[in-house]
């Protein structure tokens, strides 16, 4: 498959990143993540680097939907954080653990992110809220997945505001007022990711028809 969706998101910590926390909207961040899972689950593979605030959120939404999400999500987790893994990791059967490099956080995260962007073929990357890691992932995504679609959900604030500024210089055609003002995130992601509401959800990607038109719901 060549239409994986990458998610870069976090809720800024006011102690570690007060400036990002000040500009962020935690309610909007949670709503946007929930909406992205709702739109993609059973339709597109969602990939992200494990984050203690985001992974549990994705698990809850997936379980609420009653969809078998084991084949539709791909979670990368650095062994640097092995003693901090959330219990929710156990619910995901497709977790890729990456090397702890010399017990250094920067090198370990770089290793994880390089693997995410070189082992998968993405259609788009979605940036929601976040701190410095969002900027790092944006830069690496552009390097390893050049020319792919990028969606900074500006209304969530945080480091995503910096992603918008970078795109305003390098790819202004990707921007639009809806990134700031459309708070109906389900509608927003259906439109921005070009995923029709008529698309059926499938138990796993292997049985999903390659032709998008063949995935549409049809009356009996």
Task: Identify what each model region corresponds to.
Residues 1-5:
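Extreme N-terminal starter segment of soluble prokaryotic enzymes
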Residues 8-219:
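Acidic/glycine-enriched connector segments
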């Amino acid at each position: 498959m060549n239409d994986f969706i990458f998610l870069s998101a976090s809720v800024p910590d006011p102690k570690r990143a007060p400036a990002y926390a000040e500009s962020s909207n935690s309610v909007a961040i949670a709503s946007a993540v929930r909406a992205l899972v709702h739109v993609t689950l059973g339709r597109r593979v969602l990939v992200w680097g494990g984050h203690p605030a985001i992974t549990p959120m994705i698990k809850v939404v997936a379980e609420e939907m009653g969809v078998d999400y084991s084949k539709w999500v791909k979670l990368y987790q650095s062994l640097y954080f092995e003693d901090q893994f959330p219990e929710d990791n156990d619910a995901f059967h497709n977790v890729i653990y990456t090397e702890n490099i010399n017990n250094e956080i920067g090198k370990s995260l770089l290793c994880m992110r390089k693997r995410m962007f070189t082992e998968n073929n993405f259609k788009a990357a979605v940036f929601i809220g976040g701190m410095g890691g969002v900027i790092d992932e944006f830069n690496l995504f552009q390097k390893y997945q050049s020319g792919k679609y990028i969606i900074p959900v500006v209304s969530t604030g945080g480091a995503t505001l910096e992603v918008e500024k970078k795109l305003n210089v390098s790819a202004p055609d990707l921007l639009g007022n809806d990134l700031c003002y459309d708070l109906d995130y389900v509608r927003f992601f259906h439109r921005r990711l070009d995923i029709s509401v008529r698309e059926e959800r499938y138990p796993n990607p292997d049985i999903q028809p390659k032709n998008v038109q063949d995935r549409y719901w049809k009356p009996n």
